[in-house]
Amino acid sequence: MNRYFRDMTPARHEKLTRVLAKRQADLTVVLENVFDPHNISAVMRTCDAVGVQEIFILNTKIPRHKKFGARSSSSAAKWLTVHQFEDAEACFSEIKRRYERILTTHLGESSVGLYKIDLTRPTALVFGNEHSGVSDEIRALADGNFLIPQVGIIQSLNISVACAVTLYEAFRQKEQAGHYDRQDLDSAFKQNVWNTWSVNNDSD
């Protein structure tokens, strides 16, 4: 046990242990060219809330993000494993190696409604740029598209809202399937997360 854990209170240790036990290895979020760092931070906070440990941030058209909006995130970024890529092929090669399928948000005729998708399968969920959505290039790499059912006039949601709706549907399905009652992370990755969290144990 390193010195950071020795300095940790029992209550803090119990909390981190409990949270880590709920982290899901078979669900991730991919953000393609999302411009506003506050949107990214809001997505990170939702990822943390539902037990998604990893998030992939792909920047092919905008500068690499150096930091995320602290106001929205409540420092959620430091509790997640954040992968940043500037090359789409490299990003999705890594994702395909680790996840069974890739689904993108897209308002198209071939898209399936969110509530008809089995989100208990290992899945990477892709959300696109605030203005143009997921690019044709990335949709070509995906295994399918989905949409969030709506009955209003405006047929789009803010990226962080769309992600929250989707992740909480995944949470609902995975909780019913008992996924949060099992240890999901492999031992090496789990240890890496522990090591990172031990440095960040001073605050939420």
Functional labels for PLM-detected ranges:
Residues M1-D204:
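Post-transcriptional modification and biogenesis factors for structured RNAs
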